[in-house]
């Protein structure tokens, strides 16, 4: 309602990544007590959205202790997340992606592990929260920097590291994020063909035309781009039509369903065929058996990723 609209405008006005206003980058005190004005507005908007999901539409008079508690929890989570990112208190692990026919290594996907989830824990909940709360851009930039450092470290000892970094669709909608990313990449000329990007479909991209312009900028700099989680969301084919990408990673659920549902192989075959017609290379996820690898090869999937070829780990 009107309350959410007002707070959305407040977040936009305070956020240096929105509109034509460019303010200093938002900061957070690492003692866990303070948020920037922009992040405070984001916390309010996130809490209101969650509150309205369980309480329906409401007015200021409806903001009970339940909402206040939710808001405080959201603020604390944002502070903790930004502190984790600022201190680099997370680990990048790498999972191999190989040629499905020759099994030759093509590149690795860089994945994150947070201390809270353990070495093998999924970061899904924390990443989803960061996207919904509007603070995912900070993490994406930190991850890009960490992977670039890994590539450079390998180069110094004669090791060729090729890696893909995930970028949230939400990040691609932030002008500040885009400018920060491009500034970082301008200093990476020697390793540009070693670094590629995966655009995740976990968060809907509203302005596909603007997002595609970002991808074109990445292409101009010499980076390949992959559309991740293809088929996971309702807008998958809309993304494929609007975004100029070099690779498509078919969501793992379709790989698994190829062997568990009557029409699973038909859907997977159709996806692979469509991408081949568009001259886009494909990656199949969740490859855990030779049977799956053989089928992917038969239907024209180019690359494979999964436990059959290696678990996420160090390089």
Predicted region positions:
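Alpha-helical scaffold within the catalytic cores of cyclic-nucleotide enzymes
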Residues: 2-16, 43-45, 143-152
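Catalytic-core segments of nucleotide cyclases and related cyclic-nucleotide turnover enzymes
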Residues: 8, 29-56, 124, 230, ...
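Catalytic core regions of nucleotide second-messenger enzymes
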Residues: 9-26, 119, 155-161, 189
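Catalytic strand-loop-helix junctions within cyclic-nucleotide turnover domains
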Residues: 18-40, 66-69, 96-102, 114-118, ...
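Catalytic core of bacterial c-di-GMP phosphodiesterases, primarily the EAL and HD-GYP domains
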Residues: 27-34, 104-109, 135-210, 286
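C-di-GMP signaling machinery
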Residues: 34-91, 101, 129-136, 169-171, ...
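EAL-family c-di-GMP phosphodiesterase catalytic domain
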Residues: 49, 101-104, 114-119, 168-175, ...
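Active-site core of bacterial EAL-family cyclic-dinucleotide phosphodiesterase domains
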Residues: 65-129, 166, 227, 284, ...
């Amino acid at each position: 309602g009107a309350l959410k609209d007002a707070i959305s405008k407040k977040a936009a006005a305070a956020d240096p990544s929105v509109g034509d206003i460019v303010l200093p980058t938002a900061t957070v005190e690492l003692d866990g007590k303070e948020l920037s004005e922009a992040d405070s507005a984001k916390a309010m908007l996130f809490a209101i959205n969650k509150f309205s999901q369980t309480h329906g539409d409401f007015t200021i008079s409806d903001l009970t202790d339940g909402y206040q508690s939710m808001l405080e929890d959201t603020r604390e989570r944002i502070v903790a997340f930004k502190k984790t990112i600022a201190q680099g208190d997370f680990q990048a692990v790498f999972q191999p992606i190989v040629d499905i026919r020759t099994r030759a290594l093509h590149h690795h996907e860089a994945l994150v592990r947070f201390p809270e989830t353990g070495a093998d824990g999924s970061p899904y909940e924390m990443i989803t929260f960061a996207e919904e709360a509007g603070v995912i851009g900070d993490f994406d930039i930190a991850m890009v920097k960490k992977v670039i450092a890994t590539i450079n470290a390998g180069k110094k000892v004669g090791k060729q590291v090729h890696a893909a970094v995930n970028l949230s669709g939400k990040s691609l909608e932030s002008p500040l994020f885009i400018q920060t990313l491009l500034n970082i990449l301008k200093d990476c000329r020697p390793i540009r063909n070693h670094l590629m990007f995966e655009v995740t479909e976990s968060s809907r991209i509203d302005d596909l035309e603007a997002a595609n312009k970002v991808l074109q900028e990445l292409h101009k700099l010499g980076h390949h781009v992959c559309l991740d989680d293809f088929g996971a969301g309702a807008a998958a084919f809309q993304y494929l039509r609007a975004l100029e990408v070099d690779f498509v990673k078919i969501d793992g659920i379709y790989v698994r369903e190829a062997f568990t549902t009557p029409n699973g192989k038909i859907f997977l075959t159709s996806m692979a065929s469509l991408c081949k017609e568009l001259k886009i290379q494909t990656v199949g996820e969740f490859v855990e058996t030779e049977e799956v690898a053989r089928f992917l090869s038969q239907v024209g999937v180019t690359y494979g990723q999964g436990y059959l070829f290696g678990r996420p780990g160090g390089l």
